[in-house]
Amino acid sequence: HLADLCVRNKQYDRARELLQLSLQKRPDLIRELPIIAQACMAQGNFDRANELFSDYLDRVDGAERAYYDDITFIGSEGEIAAYAATANREERREFLRRFWTGRDAVPATPVNERLLEHYRRVWVAWNRYGEHQSPWDRRGEIYIRYGEPDYRARSDEIDFVKSADMRVQRVKERLALGLYGSEFVINVSSLHQGPVYPVRGTGQSPQIVAAGGSSQVPWESWIYFGLGGGIEVTFT
């Protein structure tokens, strides 16, 4: 969707303009609502984003709504079990109300920004990482858990400028130190473009490709600076 591409490129006004034109012609459209909501969130208009997401979720079927209500990737074991034990829709709604109230970082505002962020993450997981696996692949799961990564690279698309960011290098060097020892870090610290954790080759070859190498296996690597001193998640 062109408007989604605009949102990804931070062209929020353009995204809203495109979608408002579509909705003027077809008020019955609902797939555009979460995209407008994301543009509103990025511009700080959480009230409008809340209206749009609420309208969207009220109009989708129960199976789709269930993905947005699911707390599997964000709740504790006890919370997940308690939610699964709810007997009916009313109990589930009350449980979710209390669950999200407890996670509202700014309770003084009329909108629960963390809940909106969850809706945004689920939408992204479904629409960007569900092409080969329904409703989404492992990237979608991690995205729902942790949100937008601070850095990402793919085997066919490495941003050499961003990969030189000292924050990226510090995370990679710390992880490499734990995996391979200080000698490895000293020798190849300038080559940390690929994943630190080894990616195995295909076929009969036991080849293992580490940071800075090449691989026949497509991979995608995400880094989160603020988790556990910095973590890297690699998908193959």
Could you say what each language-model-derived stretch is?
Residues H1-T236:
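Scaffold/interface architecture of coatomer-like assemblies
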